[in-house]
A protein has these predicted regions:
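Conserved "landmark" site that anchors the functional core of diverse proteins
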Residues: 1-307
């Protein structure tokens, strides 16, 4: 068994996997990696099953010390990672020698990085997943939903010898301001015509009041003209519009039901891009039909089949 000791951490550093499924009828949310694409690539670099537990590091402030020689993988944001002061770029596997320190300093490009280990980090499964949901006290190293803390030990049982990189063609360019695809929802026709124009033709700024439950988009207030709604199930990526007219994108740790009208839901690929945006960043929304969104999603999944 190989071990890493956490030397520094923040409440935003969490153990995550693909999340919990089949439990929303119990009032339990999904959880899981906010940028599932990057987590999958981190696992792919080590030949892991793509949904194995990895460390989600948001905005930096995380450091580990290797207790034995090991080979790990890093994908996602550039958070100024360093090995004993030497810069380490993401989208590759790398060797960390016994006693060496891997440290994440600050965001240089993107918001979330994913650190994976051969065979995945050891953690108990709660309702079929190790994903950490702090609000629900589920998942994580102890199964109680706690963030990673200084002094804790990360262990794993696998071993990999080959160092490799994610092909350049498959790495997302986090500098691009790609529109976020939105599958239209049932209440879309109950917003004013001007609001529908503004939704897709105006920029939206990410509010600093953001967490793993949701991100508020700041811009022109939208006007809902329909009747009050009865609460209903909320899918991942749902874009709700509360009475103040400022949309909220609901993320992995969202509540399971809600009663605000919805514009629709962002696609999984759009959510992965949104997860890498810092507060204050501007985004645009683009309407897409479900068939197109599904086809693009399936095509993206084919990328992980490369050897």
């Amino acid at each position: 068994m190989s071990r890493l000791t956490i030397e520094a951490s923040t409440p935003l550093c969490l153990l995550q996997d693909a999340g919990r499924f089949g439990v929303r009828h119990l009032g339990v949310t999904q959880g899981g990696a906010a940028d599932w694409c990057s987590m999958n690539w981190a696992n792919w670099l080590l030949g892991n099953q793509l949904d194995l537990p990895a460390i989600e590091i948001t905005l930096g402030g995380f450091a580990v010390v290797a207790q034995v020689d090991c080979l790990l993988a890093l994908a996602g944001a550039d958070l100024g990672a360093q090995i004993d002061g030497q810069a380490l770029a993401p989208w590759r596997s790398f060797k960390l020698g016994q006693g060496q320190t891997l440290r994440f300093t600050q965001p240089l490009l993107g918001a979330r990085a994913y650190l994976a280990a051969p065979g995945g980090f050891d953690a108990p499964q709660v309702l079929g997943s190790s994903a950490t949901v702090v609000r629900e006290e589920l998942g994580g190293l102890d199964g109680m939903g706690l963030p990673l803390t200084k002094g804790a030990t990360l262990s794993y049982r696998g071993a990999v010898l080959q160092v490799r990189e994610v092909p350049l063609a498959h790495r997302p360019d986090l500098r691009l301001h790609t529109p976020l695809d939105l599958v239209l929802g049932a209440q879309i026709g109950q917003f004013s015509g001007q609001s529908l124009f503004d939704v897709f033709n105006s920029p939206w700024a990410l509010d600093s009041r953001a967490d793993r439950m949701g991100i508020r988009l700041l811009g022109t207030a939208l006007q809902y003209q329909g009747r009050p709604m009865i609460s209903e199930g909320i899918p991942l990526g749902a874009v709700q519009v509360p009475p103040d007219g400022q949309p909220i994108v609901l993320l992995n740790d969202r509540q399971t039901i809600g009663g605000y009208p919805r514009l629709g839901a962002l696609t999984p690929l759009a959510l992965a891009r949104l997860a890498q945006c810092l507060p204050g960043a501007q985004v645009r929304l683009r309407p897409v039909v479900q068939d197109v969104a599904h086809r693009e999603h399936v095509e993206y999944l084919q990328r992980f089949r490369i050897s």
